[in-house]
Amino acid sequence: PVRAFRNVDGDPFFVRSAKGSRITDADGRDLIDYVGTWGPAILGHAPQAVLDAVHQAVDRGLGYGIPTPIEVDMAETVTRWFPSVKKVRMVNSGTEATMAAIRLARGYTGRRKILKFEGCYHGHVDSLLVSAGSGALTFGEPDSAGVPREFAQLTLTVPYNDREAVRDAFVRYGDDIAAIIVEPFPGNAGFYLPRHG
C-alpha cells in the first residue's frame, strides 16, 4: 500500500493493469510483480481460468449477504484437505478472520493476551498492529496512531523463531495468554523460514 513506501525509501506508483507476473504502472512502465497482492495473486494476475470462473459467478449475481451452495462446497473441501479443521466460517478478509479467531480464543479461554511474533502482520486489527513490520519494530507500543496503548499491552511480541522467548512469555504470562498467532512466512520482516520444532 501507499503508506508502506515511506518505510522502504521509495516513491509510490500506481498500477494501470496487470497480467501474469507483470504489472504496468500509470507511467506505462512494465514491471515484475514480486508482491503478488501479498498472496492472493499466487496464480499471477488475471489468469484466464480464474477470469472465466469469476465471470460465471458474476453472471449469477454480485452478492447476496446470505450463504450460497458454493460456500458449502468450499468449506467441505477445506475440511477434506485439512481433517483437523472441524468448522469453517466464511469472512470477507484476513483482518476479519484474525479478529474472529482472537475473539473466539479469548471467549473460550477467558484470557486476554495474545502472543505474536515480530514482523508478522495479521491484518489491520488494532491489538495486533504491534511490531507488525514494514518499519521499525515497536515493543508493546502501537505501530499506528489511533490505536490505544491498552490494546497493544494485551499483545505480547517475541522474536520469530525464538522458542526460548516463547517459553519465557508463557512462564511470565501463561495464565493470561489466550492464543499464539503466527504468520508461517513473515511477509513484513524479510523472508524468514520457520525453524523445525
Region locations from a protein language model:
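Gly-rich Lys/Arg/Thr-decorated short loops/hinges at beta-loop-alpha junctions or inter-strand turns
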Residues: 55-59, 145-153, 181-186
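Glycine-rich loop-to-alpha-helix module at the N-terminal edge of alpha/beta enzyme cores
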Residues: 30-112
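Short beta-strands and strand-loop turn motifs
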Residues: 32-35, 179-185
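Active-site core of PLP-dependent enzymes with the aminotransferase class I/II
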Residues: 165-169, 185-197
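Active-site and channel-lining beta-strand-loop segments
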Residues: 12-33
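Alpha-helix capping and helix-loop boundary segments enriched in small/acidic/polar residues
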Residues: 65-66, 92, 157, 189-193
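Active-site-adjacent loop/helix segments that line or gate small-molecule/cofactor pockets in enzymes
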Residues: 1-17
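PLP-dependent aspartate aminotransferase-fold enzymes
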Residues: 76-178
